[in-house]
């Protein structure tokens, strides 16, 4: 049997896996495209995103471990809280390919709204199991509100732009 820290570490690191896959869309051409877009003055510098997302993914991953542990593993009771978590995480991981890969700012905004709703539902479900796990999601919910607002502003201010060229209306 594995030492108790192994599942804790696995759950904590798991959310970052999708981040690594999605990050390939945030390099090279995707970044050049993004650099050419109109952005509000309050948008964060690029170097902030790695530490912020790394911290948020680690917190939500550890929270999922707390829920898993409290419910005795992948039991019937864990289906809703861990299912909601998995769903919001998949939606979260879909954002970089939608925004940077397909350059679909409007659909990326829809994705973020879905992520936010699923993350809020996850927080409520987790609170019933482990208030600490739910509290670990609070910074994530705040960041989602910020990034959703940022995505909206970028979409609004660049409506009709794709790849540096104006699209026909």
Swiss-Prot record:
**As annotated in Swiss-Prot or TrEMBL, what is the tissue specificity of this protein?**
Found in many tissue types. Expressed at the highest levels under normal conditions in tissues that synthesize steroids.
Give GO terms: molecular function aspect only: androgen binding; benzodiazepine receptor activity; cholesterol binding; cholesterol transfer activity; transmembrane transporter binding
Cytoplasmic-facing ranges: 27-46, 101-105, 156-169
Q: Per the annotation, which location comes first and is thus the protein's main one?
A: mitochondrion
Subcellular location as annotated: Mitochondrion membrane
Keyword Transport on this protein? yes
Query: What keywords appear on the UniProt entry?
Result: Lipid transport, Membrane, Mitochondrion, Receptor, Transmembrane, Transmembrane helix, Transport
Domain of life, per UniProt, equals Eukaryota
Under the heading Pfam families, the entry gives: TspO_MBR (PF03073)
An example of a Gene Ontology BP annotation on this entry? negative regulation of glial cell proliferation
Where does the chain cross the membrane? 6-26, 47-67, 80-100, 106-126, 135-155
> What's this protein's function?
Can bind protoporphyrin IX and may play a role in the transport of porphyrins and heme. Promotes the transport of cholesterol across mitochondrial membranes and may play a role in lipid metabolism, but its precise physiological role is controversial. It is apparently not required for steroid hormone biosynthesis. Was initially identified as peripheral-type benzodiazepine receptor; can also bind isoquinoline carboxamides.
Tell me how this protein assembles: Interacts with TSPOAP1. May interact with STAR. Interacts with MOST-1. Interacts with TMEM97. Forms a complex with TMEM97 and PGRMC1; the interaction occurs in MIA PaCa-2 cells but not in MCF7 cells.
**The protein's name in its UniProt record:** Translocator protein
């Amino acid at each position: 049997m594995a030492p108790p820290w192994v599942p804790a570490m696995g759950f904590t690191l798991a959310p970052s896996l999708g981040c690594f896959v999605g990050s390939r869309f945030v390099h090279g051409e995707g970044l050049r495209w993004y650099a050419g877009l109109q952005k509000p003055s309050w948008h964060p510098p690029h170097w902030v995103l790695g530490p912020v997302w790394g911290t948020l993914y680690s917190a939500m991953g550890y929270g999922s471990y707390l829920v898993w542990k409290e419910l005795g593993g992948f039991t019937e009771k864990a289906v809703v809280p861990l299912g909601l978590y998995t769903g919001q995480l998949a939606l979260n991981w879909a954002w970089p390919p939608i925004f940077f890969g397909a350059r679909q700012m409007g659909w990326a905004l829809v994705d973020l709204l879905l992520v936010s709703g699923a993350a809020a539902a996850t927080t409520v479900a987790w609170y019933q199991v482990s208030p600490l796990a739910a509290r670990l999601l609070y910074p994530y919910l705040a960041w989602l509100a910020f990034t959703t607002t940022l995505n909206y502003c970028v979409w609004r201010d660049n409506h009709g732009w794709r790849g540096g060229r104006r699209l026909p209306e």
